[in-house]
Amino acid sequence: LSFGNEVHCTCPLDKGDGSVVRSIDPYGHLLTTTYGDDAVWQLPEMDFSQTHWYGDGSQRDCVTTIVNIHRHHLERYRKPFLLGEFGIDWRTSDLTYDPKGNALHWHNGIWASLMSGGMGTACVWYWDNYIDRLNLWHHFRPVAEFVRLVGKAWLQNWRPLKHTDPVADVLSHEQQFGDFVFTPTLGWQRPTGDTFVLHRNGKVESDGETSVFLFSPSKPDLYRPPKFIVDFPQDGVMAIQVGTVSSGSVLIVRIDGKEVWRQGLPEGAERKDEQGRTYREGSYREKRWVEQWRKWDYVYDREFVVPVPKGKHTIEVDNQGADWCTVTQIRFSPYRDLKFPEVDIVGIQTETAALIWVHNQQSNFQNEREREQGIRGELKPIKGLRFEVLGLKDGKYSIVLWDTWKGAITAKWQAQCRQGKLLLRLPDLQRDFALWITSR
């Protein structure tokens, strides 16, 4: 039972409601709400914490965001967590982006949530005009069968998975570098961190999370621009993916404290439309009038590229405009050492078991759309993928490989854990698969 839907509830209200419901409910419904803050979720009346998350259609995937949302709520409030709603774009159905029903965003979201320790899979909102219309119900079977396979083991005291950096086979013995894609994970809120150290193995070390909304000083309670500590192996670029600009933004990049790039958005002159509303011309894809706020949103969905010299630098990304814009990702290139593959390893473990979801980051809904449009090549498998699970008790373990699309076991083998390290050598990774590891 949820006391509210996307309402920022106050602590006294929820405490009072919880006591009343407990006294009259003979069935013992679990109690929650959306949205809640620290005071709300720490109430004993709240059986589990919950939130909703939607993108704006310009993000490439949802995995990192969903994993971070789960980890934040589970670690902070120490009670079960459910992502009660999620989707590609808060303004429209997933059908708009996935008319053929490949279900990649949804698929990745439910597996990322389950294997992050969620009390259930993340819940998609668009049942009628997406799931039912395209008859996507069969995607539930593989995850349901996997839950059944694990059985009562779900009731163990799980903790986040610890593992070494994954490595994979490379075509050349020479060191090669590719894209490092940084993805903001928060929605409409003040960032919890502002400093991000980017390691060439693909890891991010930070003091918190930043928002997809790059707020300007016009919202002082939300304004906290990010800075990145980088070490470029050679001269390269930082490419800022701008989604939507609200009214107007001025993006600024500073390298080691010196401004090196500035871009006003929209870029053009003022004009009036047929209704006399003032707007600006620019290189945006489209403009949308938001009647509620009497303002224009300008949809760009494009990269703005800033050169970065070789070596160690501190890069600040700021917005000094009239209002916010969304930055859905920032690409640093060449930066990431290619011996470290672009994979997500999401999981939970005990001392004698582990549940792991392994995901090829190139398997996402945006890349799939580009393949359908003929502007991106076929998805290539990652070969020779291997990493070690850390913190298991020494001994022999059984490993089950699960096909997350067909809902079947595709391989079984055994491996020895020595000195708390269990080496996993995995088959070619095309899209994703799951692992169920148990001691013998």
Label the model's feature ranges.
Residues 78, 90-91, 108-239, 246, ...:
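Aromatic- and carboxylate-lined catalytic core of secreted/periplasmic carbohydrate-active enzymes
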Residues 37, 72, 101, 105, ...:
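Generic detector of short alpha-helix boundary/capping microenvironments
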Residues 382, 416-421:
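Short, solvent-exposed loop/turn segments in extracellular or other extracytoplasmic domains
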Residues 299:
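Active-site-adjacent structural elements in folded domains
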Residues 2-134, 138-139, 380-381:
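Extracellular glycoside hydrolase catalytic/binding regions
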Residues 49, 277-281:
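Short, surface-exposed amphipathic charged segments that create phosphate/polyanion-binding patches used
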Residues 52-54, 315, 416:
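Compositionally biased, intrinsically disordered low-complexity segments enriched
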